[in-house]
Every structure is written in C-alpha cells, then in structure tokens.
C-alpha cells in the first residue's frame, strides 16, 4: 500500500484531541492525596487543570513542561505529525512561554503500517518544531495497536509572566484566536459530508501555530490564557472560571466559527467527544439549543488561545494579534461569581 493511498484515520478508534479520556473519568484517575506533591518551586501542577507544569528556577525564570499525543485526525501522515506537534507546542505558548526543545512520542502498529509512513509522521512533527524555532531532539517509540504521535516539550518563561487559569479576573473580556468547529468538520469528512469548498480548512487551522501567546503574555492586561483543545470551548472556559472563582457570559454570535459548521452539526457530524464533554461540563451551562451546545462542546485539536483581557488592554492585544495575522473580536466577558447562576451563560 502506497503512502498516498493510506488512510491513517481508519487505523484508530479516536481522532486528535477527541480521543482524550473524559474529564469525569480523568477526575477519578487523578483524585489522590499522593498526587498533591508539595514543592514551593512548583508554581503550576494539576490542581487548576492548566496546560502545562511550571517550575520556578529561582532566578526570575521558570521552566514549563508539557506532553501531548493522540491518534490520527487526518489521513495524510505528514499533516498528522505536523498537527500533533503544533498541538503539543501550543501548551507552552498558552502558559506565556517560549519553547526550547521537544522529544517525540511514537506508537506504531509495525505489522499494519510501514516504517516509511511513520517517518513521514515524524517529518511533519519536525517541520512544526522548526516553525517554532526548536529542535526535535529525540524521543521514544513503542509497537502499538494504533498509530500515536505527539511531543513532550520544554519551554521557559519569565516567572512574573506565567499565565494560569486561576489568574483570570472579573471584568476581563474574552477573546479566541481560532474558529471553532474542527471536530465537526473532520467528522463531516469521515462521513463523506464535507463539501469541496470546505476541504482542507480544518487542517489549515490545526497547523496554525499559537506563537502569538508569548507576545500576549508580555501585555500586563492579559490576566489568563489557555488553549482550547479536547474539552471544547465550554470545558476550557469552565476550568478557567472554576480556577479563578468567576463566571462567564458568552455572545454566541461573536464566536468565530469554521465555514459550514452549523450546517454539518444539523447533518449529524458530531464527534463522540462532544457528548463526553457535555456529560462532564453540561451542568455548568445555562439553557441553550442542541446545536449551540454541540458547537461549544466540540473537541478542538490544535485549537486557538482563549484570552482573558482587562478592557484597558484590549487595543494593545488586538494590535499584537494583528502582527500575527489574527483578527480578534470579544466573544464575552467574565463577571463576579454568584450562586444560583450558570457558570457559563450563552447570550
């Protein structure tokens, strides 16, 4: 079988960040007193569900450490590697940092898929690393039943510029740097529903590097930042609200969306991860139509950055975004928490 005819998505039961373990199950796995390692230099662990761990070196600089890997979300091997690497590196940018090196994580069904295809995957990962200005310095591989690829990435950040979920504040405006609908469009493609004019749109968005995060972190009024991935906008926004003790009001019409996404939702192109996300976070939402819920819970792979920005910094944030070719519009705001009200209200 040639590399051009291979369909990687047929060799896995999940796709991209949609194959994450559900938040409910993950909570059970992580719920342990022994998981609460006490080290005053560990600035960010897993308590607030942030994108990466952060360790203070004591000299004004902190180290960021993260890992991310998944099964194919596209059929093209090079694109799969590039997307997986871009997604992993994004965690460093979401914490306000600069990546400095990466190592690869590869699981490969050697009796089903040739090593030449695995090489294409790793070349895609290496390409993304070059885009981020870092080396793919090594890695580890295993014989697996399904193809898996990703990175463990190390970065650095000025300690005072670390961006965490828990540092969001009431009064902040919310901005999203990429459109939603990646899970929907990739599912539509698998179901042969995707229109010719929408071919390649999701791949282009997934390959777009969140490199602007390091520049956003230098803006005083950017209070919190996270990337929107497998738990969808609802999940990652809810975790920001829970960490900071605030609530969110979101303007649905202002949310950037991939072309055709609402039509594909009506046609049933909804990934399985959407239901898992709703089962974990749905109780935090107000009432809304099913199609709105399906978009907000849509698992994103290599999604955009979600920023919480004080109003006085809005113009500076938009100007910085424009330098990276990003057009920003506020999608909502954070407000003080009040009992009896949904954590995330959709208007």
UniProtKB/Swiss-Prot annotation:
Pfam families: AIRS, AIRS_C. This is Selenide, water dikinase. One of its GO terms (molecular function) is magnesium ion binding. GO terms for biological process: selenocysteine biosynthetic process. Mg(2+) binds at residues 51, 91, 227. Its cofactor is Mg(2+). NCBIfam families: PRK00943.1, selD. It comes from Shigella sonnei (strain Ss046). Belongs to the selenophosphate synthase 1 family. Class I subfamily. Signal peptide: none annotated. Gene3D superfamilies: PurM-like C-terminal domain, PurM-like, N-terminal domain. Its EC number is 2.7.9.3. The gene is selD. The keyword ATP-binding applies. It catalyses: hydrogenselenide + ATP + H2O = selenophosphate + AMP + phosphate + 2 H(+). The keyword Electron transport does not apply. Synthesizes selenophosphate from selenide and ATP. Homodimer. It is an enzyme of class 2 (transferase). ATP binds at residues 20, 48-50, 68, 91, 139-141. Binds 1 Mg(2+) ion per monomer. The active site is at residue 17. The record marks 20 as: Important for catalytic activity. GO terms for cellular component: cytoplasm. Keywords: ATP-binding, Kinase, Magnesium, Metal-binding, Nucleotide-binding, Selenium, Transferase.
């Amino acid at each position: 079988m040639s590399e051009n005819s291979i369909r990687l998505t047929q060799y896995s039961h999940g796709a991209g960040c949609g194959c994450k373990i559900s938040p409910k199950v993950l909570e059970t796995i992580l719920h342990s007193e022994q998981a609460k390692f006490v080290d005053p230099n560990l600035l960010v662990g897993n308590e607030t569900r942030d994108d990466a761990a952060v360790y203070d070196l004591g000299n004004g600089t902190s180290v960021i450490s993260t890992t991310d890997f998944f099964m194919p979300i596209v059929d093209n091997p090079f694109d799969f590697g590039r997307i997986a690497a871009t997604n992993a590196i994004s965690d460093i940018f979401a914490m306000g940092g600069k990546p400095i090196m990466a190592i690869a994580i590869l699981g490969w069904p050697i009796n089903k898929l040739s090593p030449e295809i695995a090489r294409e995957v790793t070349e895609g990962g290496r390409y993304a690393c070059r885009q981020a200005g870092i080396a793919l310095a090594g890695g580890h591989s295993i014989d697996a039943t399904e193809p898996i690829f990703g990175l463990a990435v190390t970065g650095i950040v000025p300690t005072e510029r670390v961006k965490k979920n828990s540092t969001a504040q009431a009064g902040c405006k919310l901005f999203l740097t990429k459109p939603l609908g990646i899970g929907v469009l990739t599912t539509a493609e698998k179901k042969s529903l995707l229109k010719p004019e929408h071919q390649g749109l999701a791949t282009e968005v997934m390959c777009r590097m969140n490199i602007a995060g390091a520049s956003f972190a230098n803006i005083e009024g950017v209070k919190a930042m996270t990337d929107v991935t497998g738990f969808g906008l609802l999940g990652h926004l809810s975790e920001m609200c829970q960490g900071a003790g605030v609530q969110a009001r979101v303007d649905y019409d202002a949310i950037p969306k991939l072309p055709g996404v609402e039509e594909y939702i009506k046609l049933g192109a909804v990934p399985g991860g959407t239901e898992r996300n709703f089962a974990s976070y749905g109780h935090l939402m107000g009432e809304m139509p099913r199609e709105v819920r399906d978009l907000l819970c849509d698992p994103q792979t290599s999604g955009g950055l979600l920023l919480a920005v004080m109003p006085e910094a809005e113009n500076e944030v938009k100007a910085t975004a424009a330098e990276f070719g990003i057009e920003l519009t506020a999608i909502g705001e954070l407000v003080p928490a009040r009992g009896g009200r949904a954590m995330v209200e959709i208007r």
